Amino acid sequence: MSDAVQSVTVGRRSIPISHPGKQLFTSPAISKLTLARHYARVSEAMLPHVRDRPLALEAFPQGIAGQGFFMKSVPAHFPDWITTTEVPKRGGSLIQVLANDPATLVYLAGQNVVTPHVWLARTIDLRRPDRLIIDLDPSPGVSFADVRAAARDAGERLRAAGLATFAMVTGSRGVHVVSPLRPEAEFATVHRLARALAEAMVSDAPNRLTLEWHRSERGRRIYLDVNRIAYAQHVVAPYGVRARSRAPVAMPIAWEELSDPRLRPDRWTVRTVAGRLESDGDAWARIARHARRLPTLRT
């Protein structure tokens, strides 16, 4: 592929992609231009899930075989048409990117951003999340069948508490179980409920599940991570590409797919996601309609 600048047009903007032939992935070879086109293709499905959420940007200037890094503050060279927000932090504030239009997603890919990560709260109130997420992260040697079973268990418990449940394979190793919330409770309150649910799961299956943060202490168990439910924490965005072989994509799925033995956490890639959306649409298209008030924690 020529190294001359090429453009990707989305809406009214034409985004120049420098070094479009740069291979960001080598197994198989996937270029920066292919990455940019991926985000253009998925933008209609992706934007409702990321709009107005501050982003942490995982970039790989030399491709995923090289050193990656996270960007939280907006670099000075970013164009002024990109929407940003000021995020308060201890001792000051950060200016962070908001992916509120397709052109921003494409521009970020052109800046070697492979994976955007999003807050669980939106700018309307950054201290009150509209998502509760349990991230099921298996240790090496744990079967994905066990991950699927644990995700279904988490869903049953959340529904028993009065919440709706959605699922996403992360494109890496695990599954996110997600309950949409009305943004009324602060992070600490939401975290307490998620933690209590996770503790009950671990109590019922201590040989399969753990809340141990240190990887060396987990053994061959599934880590139930609820610690992303906190101010300034972030999770991989739906339809975000992961920095792994084959360029797998974090894919929202129908809840029933958690019972499919063919399901894998990296089943969909930049080369197959378009077909999935064409045939099945966005599995989270109605997630916002199911947002509910956080239930009272029973003691």
Segments (PLM) and residue ranges:
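Charge-rich, low-complexity segments
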Residues: 1-99, 103-109
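Flexible loop/turn segments at secondary-structure boundaries
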Residues: 64-67, 77, 142, 174-176, ...
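A short beta-strand motif that forms the metal-chelation/ATP-contact edge
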Residues: 176-182, 222-226
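Signature for HUH/AEP ssDNA processing cores
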Residues: 97-170, 181-183, 187-189, 299
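C-terminal accessory nucleic-acid interaction domains of nucleic acid-metabolism proteins
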Residues: 1-36, 47, 51, 93, ...
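Short beta-strand
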Residues: 57-60, 165-171, 212-216
